[in-house]
Amino acid sequence: MIQTQTMLEVADNSGARQVMCIKVLGGSHRRYATVGDIIKVTVKEAIPRGKVKKGQVLKAVVVRTRKGVRRPDGSLIRFDGNAAVLLNNQDAPIGTRIFGPVTRELRNEKFMKIISLAPEVL
């Protein structure tokens, strides 16, 4: 469950290390985002010579949450931290590699690129 002011790790090689959620997209008073939701983020920490700079405002898709994802069979997939993958204005990933596992809930036509780049799909 990601809300405004939540800090997230970045799970790609775009150059950002940490981002902060500034808005949950999809509805005028939407409070929380979960795995597969698009959020607006600002870069809080970045590496030198990366594709993104500190202070930049971008879109991101949430790929891992501490809260977890409940599956229809009753199982819960939970992670150690919150992570996101940065997106450009066309909702395509900025980075060319994805680090760490992602969940099967991302498997729709919008995020198949992230699924194919991920080392592990849970």
Curated annotation (Swiss-Prot):
The entry's keywords: Ribonucleoprotein, Ribosomal protein, RNA-binding, rRNA-binding
Entry's Gene Ontology BP terms: translation
One Gene Ontology molecular-function label: structural constituent of ribosome
Pfam families with a match to the protein in the record: Ribosomal_L14 (PF00238)
Entries under CDD domains matching the protein: Ribosomal_uL14
Highest taxon listed in the record's lineage: Bacteria
One Gene Ontology CC term in the entry: cytosolic large ribosomal subunit
Function: Binds to 23S rRNA. Forms part of two intersubunit bridges in the 70S ribosome.
Family: Belongs to the universal ribosomal protein uL14 family.
Xref: HAMAP family: Ribosomal_uL14
Subunit composition and interactions: Part of the 50S ribosomal subunit. Forms a cluster with proteins L3 and L19. In the 70S ribosome, L14 and L19 interact and together make contacts with the 16S rRNA in bridges B5 and B8.
Protein name: Large ribosomal subunit protein uL14
